[in-house]
């Protein structure tokens, strides 16, 4: 492994993971969806022990290579740092580790997991932060480019491309993503991997393991002349050139120091060959090790325990629909329950980006902050679509088949008589009846004694699956006359 190979691998991973959040066709996920599932925190929440063990072994073998290659937020910081390097070369300096801050941030994540507020802890989780940045800022640009290409192709009588809607997913997520992006840019532009070594809880855990990695960058004191060039180019600020020491808990194995050393005094070699190197600049005491091990055990135990406007034929004024006041929020099919979603979802926004019907959006409620909730102002949850269950890397939305989805009831339809155009405007309407995919809605005479009286909908809640077709296609504005009330725990019909 050298820095060039590391950069190439990092760019490949970064590009493909980014495309997972940008692609609206589903083609990218078919081939590269596994890249989301090998992210550390999603793998832990999904209890994907194979991936977790694999990442632990990789770290024990090569150090924090995960942070330089697999983690998209790490590569994004390297991109920001590259701009900083263009502004000023040799700008880094060695700094002492901010261990207390690192442990506090890890503790915040653990407490959030224990309390079931996974999305709150996900505010500082690397994969989730990157997902919000990609889906909020990069996806609209990608979609605009696609629409321009589709428009040009159409002018050439080609329909190889199609336009997609670009919609506002919510102000809260935008603000959080913007603050995260700006903070990361400032930190990385000035100081390289500050986030990774002070805030990122994944970096803290892997940093503990990397102290004992088999392969390490080692300083050969017989060749080193103490020029400090390696330290001034270390993005992790972990090389103490005066004492010929490297803090392996913060080293992200970028291997830039090896490229910069003119004396060839730094090698990436097995631990057994490190006899000529100075001791690590940040040796861990037993208290710190116990703290990390303890919090890891608590986290593992808690996770294991937790486990466009529509034309309506002139029936109503054309205006945007408003979200009904649901007593129980709707969660996506496959999420099992509101609790399961809250305890496993990292609010990465991948399911929201992948939803072709635009029914998923980030929640603003503290209990499920930025996690997906189902709403039907822009579309409805088509029975044949299982995209969200296919892309979720954490198990917050379990994989389900199309057949299984048709038997999952995430909620049931409720009719509001005062909002219905039949009652309010004395107009004939049977939109909900005609579009219900399960036949759960029947039309009956408003006046049982007069068969010619206007017909109103009657809902069979035993057949309704809560897809929202009735709510979405209802011509009543601003509130639909029929809406879906959610279930805390999904039911099978």
Where do the language-model regions lie?
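Non-ligating segments of multi-cofactor redox enzymes
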Residues: 1-244, 249-250, 256-493
